[in-house]
Every structure is written in C-alpha cells, then in structure tokens.
C-alpha cells in the first residue's frame, strides 16, 4: 500500500483486524479494534482558476470540481466544512478575500480533501513591502479563541513586495507578547506542524540578510513595546538593534526580522515584522550546529526554566561566579572558557 501523509488526528490503520488492506482512519483507536470511519485515501484537493495575489480590480474565480465530488468553500478565512457554501459556479471576488475550499467524495470512499487556500487582493490593497496573509477560525478580531497557551490552526501566505505569490504553509498559531497584548495589533507565533499533513516548514528565504531557507516557527509583532498607543513609538527600535548586531557581528543571538503588512482573514491588520524564534531547536541547529539533545536552553520570565536539556552546567557556573573572587585572573579566565564574554557586553 502507498501509505502517505495524513491530516491532523488521522492515522493509517488496517481496514480489519489483522487484515492486509490499509486505510485512512479519521477516528483512530490506538491499541483497540478499528471501528468505522475508514477511507481509501483523501478526496482530490480543489484547484482554483486564478493564482493568489494582487489584482487591479475584481475577478471571478472558478474551482475545479472532480467528477463525483462536491466542493464547499468560505470567503471569511474560516476552514470550510460540510456545512459551508456549496460551489455551483465561479465566485465573484470584488474585495480582498481569503478563499478556502474543500472537496467531498460523494461515494464516501475517500475522506474529505485537504483545504486549498488563496488570498486575492483587489484594487487599492497594494503595498511597497512584502505582505503576509494569515487565516483561521475566530482570528478576525486579533484574539485567539484558545487564549493564552491555546493553539489554533492557521494558514499563512507570503507575497513579495511586487505582489507576486511567494510561499504558503499550514500550521498552528498562538498569542505572543505580554504588555503588547493590551492593544489591537497583537503579536502571534506561527508554528508549522508536519503532523497536520500539509507542510513541515516554510521553505523560502524569508530574510534578506540571512541565507536560512526553512522555518518551522516565526514570531509576528507590531513593534511590541515600541508601538504602545499611550506614548510615542518609532516602530523600529528592536528590529534596528538586532539588524545592527548582525551587520556589526556583535556575537549576539539576533532575531532576524523583516517588515511586512499583515492581513488577518482578509482584513488589513497593519504593519508588522516577522522574526526568527530563538527558543527554537531549528535556530540553534542552523546557527550553532546544535540540534535537539545537544543543547541546553534556559529561559527566564519571572523565573528560570529549561526549555531544552538540563540547567545543571549553567547553575554550576553561576555558583562559581557568585562564590569566587572574580578579580582573580585565573577565575576570570576559567569563566571566559565557559561562555562568550562578548555576548554579554
């Protein structure tokens, strides 16, 4: 059998206990007999007649409907389902819209398809910097339904400054930031998860000053505390400092950033910047050749904890520094072998 990827919370399973036929199980039962909800494969993913991107005026988008299937679609950024609008003919897109579609095999042999997503920008919605369109259920007010610690599925599309489509991916998202969540342009984290069946990473060179071309995690922020509504903000301080550190080779853990315009479920959400996520094992693998199980990563916010690995070596060093005479050259030289002094200056 050709066992490929599955959608979230699905699995490949034997069609009958001990049988030789494998099928997609949409309601997995680990260590128990497989029940109903078994399918040969997935229905064909819908195909749109027009590419995602910027258009001077409105357009009519047709969707290819495979024989024996029906297509359901949404225009509000939400994931379509069996109760969404039935596709019966070309869809008129008069304003900036996130069009999402799913197909259903009317015979019941195949499970519902993967979701196709295209964002169409029309008329005055054109920009001189790159644009990112994010879409998902319940995100149009800038608040994630799951709240703090809650992950919500998100589709993300990147467009070049000239309006051409660049790359897309599907993953999870959650709220990011602390004080900056007091205003409308909230920050969020995006995480590509291969277990959702779409992508394992955003595969594109997203930053002009770095050659990195695969990203599982990104942070989106509207300048954070340099954008408070109750005091003047430059909107660039943090990004500027990180970029300066990179160009001056200051030996710091810079979060490379890039300015962009964000649209959320088709709504203009303003100027943001997206950044690398430092507490991401892909970050340490890329820049330090230290993959998971080979790095200790500690974080501090109101307390200190180990994000990866162990904190034993760090606490041993802290105890040495706080208990020994650091004016002694030998002690200082020893500590200098355990960390990069320039990164602390």
Question: What residue ranges belong to the model's regions?
Answer:
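Short, well-structured beta-strand/strand-turn elements
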Residues: 247-261
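Reverse-transcriptase-like RNA-dependent polymerase core
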Residues: 183, 188-213
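Zn2+-dependent metallopeptidase catalytic core
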Residues: 154-163, 236-251
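Short, compositionally stereotyped local motifs that mark structural "simplifiers"
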Residues: 5-173, 195
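ATP-dependent phospho-/nucleotidyl transfer catalytic cores
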Residues: 202-234, 273-345
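Extracytoplasmic/secreted proteins, especially bacterial periplasmic and envelope-associated proteins
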Residues: 236, 240, 244, 258, ...
């Amino acid at each position: 059998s050709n066992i490929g990827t599955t959608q979230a919370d699905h699995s490949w399973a034997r069609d009958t206990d001990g049988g030789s036929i494998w099928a997609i199980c949409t309601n997995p039962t680990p260590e128990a007999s497989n029940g109903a909800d078994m399918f040969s494969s997935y229905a064909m993913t819908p195909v749109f007649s027009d590419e995602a991107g910027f258009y001077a005026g409105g357009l009519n988008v047709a969707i290819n409907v495979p024989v024996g299937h029906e297509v359901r679609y949404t225009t509000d950024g939400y994931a379509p389902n069996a109760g969404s609008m039935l596709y019966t003919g070309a869809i008129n897109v008069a304003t900036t819209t996130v069009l999402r579609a799913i197909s259903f095999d009317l015979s019941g042999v195949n499970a519902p398809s993967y979701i196709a997503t295209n964002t169409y920008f029309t008329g005055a919605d054109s920009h001189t910097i790159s644009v990112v369109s994010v879409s998902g259920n319940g995100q149009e007010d800038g608040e994630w339904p799951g709240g703090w610690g809650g992950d919500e599925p998100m589709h993300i599309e990147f467009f070049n400054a000239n309006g051409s489509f660049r790359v897309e991916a599907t993953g999870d998202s959650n709220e990011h930031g602390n004080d900056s969540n007091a205003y409308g342009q909230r920050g969020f984290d995006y995480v590509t998860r291969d277990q959702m069946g779409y992508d394992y990473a955003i595969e594109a060179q997203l930053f002009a000053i770095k050659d990195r071309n695969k990203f599982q995690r990104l942070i989106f922020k509207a300048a954070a505390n340099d954008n408070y509504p109750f005091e003047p903000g430059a909107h660039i301080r943090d990004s500027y400092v990180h970029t300066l550190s990179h160009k001056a080779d200051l030996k710091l853990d810079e979060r490379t950033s890039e300015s962009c315009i964000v649209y959320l479920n088709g709504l203009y959400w303003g100027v943001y910047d997206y950044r690398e996520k430092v507490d991401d094992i892909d970050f340490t693998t890329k820049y330090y050749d230290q993959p998971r199980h080979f790095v200790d990563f500690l974080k501090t916010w109101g307390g200190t904890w180990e994000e990866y690995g162990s904190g034993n070596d760090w606490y041993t060093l802290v105890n040495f520094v706080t208990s020994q005479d650091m004016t002694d050259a030998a002690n200082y030289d020893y500590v200098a072998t355990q960390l990069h002094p320039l990164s602390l200056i």
